[in-house]
Structures are given as structure tokens and as C-alpha cells.
């Protein structure tokens, strides 16, 4: 009898079984005595699948193993698909090796080691390329520029450049000097021209009052309109006139009796003349008439109690009528004339304010028999000096604030003019720009309103300071 070891399929117990000689492995399944069909078991011998018809050998170990319960199948196809994907991928750097290191890090270390090994080779190749480049440059033919003509031209050009710069500086300095001399000549010419070009020589006519013609009087009036009262030409003619008067008064021929002196000092009518004069007004002034036709007359020329002067700067015709007087009176009249010139200049500066003609006649202006003293020569009526305060009164009235309630419409405010409206708007801290109609409408809109009721958009913006 043979003895074999048999491992049970259900309990996995190993037991010794005695079998008859020549028994097969199928006999072990029949001895198990299970209700499970024999087809659901198979036998292995020492880990190898044994055939059911194989004879049992003594001392061997046989195991009865149940078969696995299979499903409907299809799991193999899934394994095949997964295996195909595994075979297709080529990037396994995210995987780890058996030591737990990522393959990416391992590959980097290998590449770095190889690069360090090849560093010496790279340096050698670089040096070799540099030497080859130097050899190629040395092999090329060298060019030496030794043209003497070229060097000569360069030297000549540098010298010519220096000479041209020196000439340019000299020309610029000479042009500046000529410009300064031209300015000096122009200033001298202007200074000489400001003194005025004298026309004909002054002539003293006596007893020829009726010889002046209408043309000469018209030219005189036109020249008076064109002549500025504060021009340098009038001042130079005044100074020459006074010097001539002094010389004539100091001469022995001009001495007269005390009766004539007293009579001459009391004669003459005082007039204040300003405005535009005509030929009729010049006749009246020369003939000493006391009446005025009611129109404004321009204050003409330097006048004194010693005589009257009628001048025309355009044609150079001058008519001078002079009476004998003492030097003391002439000096006093000169002082009064200077004050009257200043008042005239102030009056013209104050927008040409016209002063009405006032005639003051003295009872001793004419003789008892109607004859004029000094051999029929009528003395010119002297002009009364006008004080600065009297002439400044109208200008002060202009700058004084106006009463807006006196104006009924904005059109009436337009008559004040742009400058006056600008001053009034500036006094109220309002916007003062725009046309005449806009300024008048803006000023009329705030008529009679207190400051807190005025539209804020009408106020002018405060001036911004400069940024530092």
C-alpha cells in the first residue's frame, strides 16, 4: 500500500492517506466525499497541476483545490486595453524607482554629471575657435594709409576753418558796433527832430490886424488841432519866445513912460480858451474882443499881459503883437504861463475836457476916446492861469461811483463806455470782460441788489498765486 499526503480543499488540513497500489489521482477526489461536483476541483502535486489519470506516488503531497467562480467575462479585455496604454507612454519621469526617488531627479543628476564631464572639452573647443579666428584675421593683408596729399588737405582745412571762425567773429563784432552807432544816430536825429523845424523867422507886426487872410487862419487852426500841447516842439518855441521877449524888454528902445506902463498893465481881457478854434476865434483873440460865440476854444500858445502871439507850426507863419511892459511883469507872466501849461497838459490827459470860455474885461482896457494905447497896437488878452484842482475835478467825477438806480435800461449804461463799465464792474468784484453790450447788461442786472443776492456766476474768479 502507498501512503500520500492529501490537503483538504475546504478545511486545508493535511492528512496521511493510504491508497492501493496503482491508484490514480481521480481516486482522491472520490474519497473526499463532498457534495460538490468533482468537476469543480483539480489536483496539484508539489505546486504543479496533476492529471486526473496520473498514478499516485508514495510519499508525495497532493492538494485538492476548488476551482474559482468565474463571472460573465470581459475582464481580460480591460487588462489588454490597460496594457496597451502602458506600452504607448514614453514619459515616465513622474514614476519612482525601487529606492523611492523620482526618475526625473535621477535623470537630471545624470545629465549634470555628463555636462560637467564635457566642460573641459567645451573650453578647449572655444579656445580653438578663437585661435582660428585670429589666424584668419592675421592672414588678411593689412592696409596702411600713407597718402601725403590727404594729410596735407586735412591740415589746410583745419587752418582755413580757424581763419573762417576768426573772420566770422570780427564780422559779428563789427555789425554789433554798426548797429549801436545807428541807434545813436537815430536817437540824435529824434532828439533834433523833437525840437521842431522852425519855419520862417519871427516877425513883429504892429497895426496890421486886418492883413491876415482866411487861408492863413485856416492853416493856423489846422496846425493847432494837430499840435500836441505837451510836445517838445512847442516847449522849444516857448523858450525861444521868452528869450526874445527878454532881449527886447531889456533894450533901451523898449523903455516907456510910467503912464504908459500903468495903462498897459491894466489893459487886456482875461480869457480861458480850450477846445477847437476857428478863423473867427483867432480874429477875436487878436483884436481883443471881450465876447465869445459860445463854443469851446482851444488854449493856444504862450500868452501874457505883455502881448499876444499867433503861431502856425505847419506853414511857419507867426503874427506877434506885443505891448511894452517892464521885465518884472514879464517874469511873473512867465511863471503864470508855466502853471497854465501844466494845467493844459493835465486837461488833455483827462480825456480832453473842454473848459468854457470866460471873458473878463477891465474898465481900463480901452482909452476914453476909443483909441487903444501904445500907438494903436492892441494888447493881446492874457489867459488866466487855470489851477490843477479845477482841471482835476472832472476826472475825479469820472472815477467816482455812479448811481445805477438812475439808469432805466442797459442801453443807457452803454453810453458810459467800455472803460467806465469795466471800472464799475471791478468795483463790485464782477466779471469785467466782454463787449460793450455784455458789460452794460451785466452791470444793469445787479442794479439795486445787495451782494448776497447777486448771481455767484457773475463774480470774477480770485487770482491764483504762482506755484513755487
Curated annotation (Swiss-Prot):
Region Disordered: start and end of each range?
Answer: 169-197, 212-397
In chain numbering, motif PIP-box lies across 33-46
GO CC aspect terms:
cytoplasm; nucleus
Q: Name one GO molecular function term.
A: snoRNA binding
Q: Which residues form a coiled coil?
A: 112-143
For biological process, the GO terms are: cell division; DNA replication; endonucleolytic cleavage of tricistronic rRNA transcript (SSU-rRNA, 5.8S rRNA, LSU-rRNA); mRNA cis splicing, via spliceosome
Q: Where is the composition biased (Polar residues)?
A: 345-374, 384-397
Reported modifications of this chain? Upon binding to PCNA, the N-terminal UBL (ubiquitin-like) propeptide is cleaved at Gly-71 by an unidentified deubiquitinating enzyme; the resulting mature SDE2 is degraded by the DCX(DTL) complex in a cell cycle- and DNA damage dependent manner.
Comp. bias regions, Basic and acidic residues: 240-250
The site feature described as Cleavage is recorded at: 71-72
Q: Which residues form the propeptide?
A: 1-71
Every copy of the SAP domain together lies at 413-447
Family per record: Belongs to the SDE2 family.
Q: Give the protein's function.
A: Inhibits translesion DNA synthesis by preventing monoubiquitination of PCNA, this is necessary to counteract damage due to ultraviolet light-induced replication stress. SDE2 is cleaved following PCNA binding, and its complete degradation is necessary to allow S-phase progression following DNA damage.
Q: What is written about domains in the entry's comments?
A: The PIP-box (PCNA interacting peptide) motif mediates both the interaction with PCNA and cleavage of the SDE2 precursor by a deubiquitinating enzyme. The SAP domain is necessary for specific binding to DNA.
Q: What name does this protein carry?
A: Splicing regulator SDE2
Organism of this sequence: Xenopus tropicalis
Amino acid at each position: 500500500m502507498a501512503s500520500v499526503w492529501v490537503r483538504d480543499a475546504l478545511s486545508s488540513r493535511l492528512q496521511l492517506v493510504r491508497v492501493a497500489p496503482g491508484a490514480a489521482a481521480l481516486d482522491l477526489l472520490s474519497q473526499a466525499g463532498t457534495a460538490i461536483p468533482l468537476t469543480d476541483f483539480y489536483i496539484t502535486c508539489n505546486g504543479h497541476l496533476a492529471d486526473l489519470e496520473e498514478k499516485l506516488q508514495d510519499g508525495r503531497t497532493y492538494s485538492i483545490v476548488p476551482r474559482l467562480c468565474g463571472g460573465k467575462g470581459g475582464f481580460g479585455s480591460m487588462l489588454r486595453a490597460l496594457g496597451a496604454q502602458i506600452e504607448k507612454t514614453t514619459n515616465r519621469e513622474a514614476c519612482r524607482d525601487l529606492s523611492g526617488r523620482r526618475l526625473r531627479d535621477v535623470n537630471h543628476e545624470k545629465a549634470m554629471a555628463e555636462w560637467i564631464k564635457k566642460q573641459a572639452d567645451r573650453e578647449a573647443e572655444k579656445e580653438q575657435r578663437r585661435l582660428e579666428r585670429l589666424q584668419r584675421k592675421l592672414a588678411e593683408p593689412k592696409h596702411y594709409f600713407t597718402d601725403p596729399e590727404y594729410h596735407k588737405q586735412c591740415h589746410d582745412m583745419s587752418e582755413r576753418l580757424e581763419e573762417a571762425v576768426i573772420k566770422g567773429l570780427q564780422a559779428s563784432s563789427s555789425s554789433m558796433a554798426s548797429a549801436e552807432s545807428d541807434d545813436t544816430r537815430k536817437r540824435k536825429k529824434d532828439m533834433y527832430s523833437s525840437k521842431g523845424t522852425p519855419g520862417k523867422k519871427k516877425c513883429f507886426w504892429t497895426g496890421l490886424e486886418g492883413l491876415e487872410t482866411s487861408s492863413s487862419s485856416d492853416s493856423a487852426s489846422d496846425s493847432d488841432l494837430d499840435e500836441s500841447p505837451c510836445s517838445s516842439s512847442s516847449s522849444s518855441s516857448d523858450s525861444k519866445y521868452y528869450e526874445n521877449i527878454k532881449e527886447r524888454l531889456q533894450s533901451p528902445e523898449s523903455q516907456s513912460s510910467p503912464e504908459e506902463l500903468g495903462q498897459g498893465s491894466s489893459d487886456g481881457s482875461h480869457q480861458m480858451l480850450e477846445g477847437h478854434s476857428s478863423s473867427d476865434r483867432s480874429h477875436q483873440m487878436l483884436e481883443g474882443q471881450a465876447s465869445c460865440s459860445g463854443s469851446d476854444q482851444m488854449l493856444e500858445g504862450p500868452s501874457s499881459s505883455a502881448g499876444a502871439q499867433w503861431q502856425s507850426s505847419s506853414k511857419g507863419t507867426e503874427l506877434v503883437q506885443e505891448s511894452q511892459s517892464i521885465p518884472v511883469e514879464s517874469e511873473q507872466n512867465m511863471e503864470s504861463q508855466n502853471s497854465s501849461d501844466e494845467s493844459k497838459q493835465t486837461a488833455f490827459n483827462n480825456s480832453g475836457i473842454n473848459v468854457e470860455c470866460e471873458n473878463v474885461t477891465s474898465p481900463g482896457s480901452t482909452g476914453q476916446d476909443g483909441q487903444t494905447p501904445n500907438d494903436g497896437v492892441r494888447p493881446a488878452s492874457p489867459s488866466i492861469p487855470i489851477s490843477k484842482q479845477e482841471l482835476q475835478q472832472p476826472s475825479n467825477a469820472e472815477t467816482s461811483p455812479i448811481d445805477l438806480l438812475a439808469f432805466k435800461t442797459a442801453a443807457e449804461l452803454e453810453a458810459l463806455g467800455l472803460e467806465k463799465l469795466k471800472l464799475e464792474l471791478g468795483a463790485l468784484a464782477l466779471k469785467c470782460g466782454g463787449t460793450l453790450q455784455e458789460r452794460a447788461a451785466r452791470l444793469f442786472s445787479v442794479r439795486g441788489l445787495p451782494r448776497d443776492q447777486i448771481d455767484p456766476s457773475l463774480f470774477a474768479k480770485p487770482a491764483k498765486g504762482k506755484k513755487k
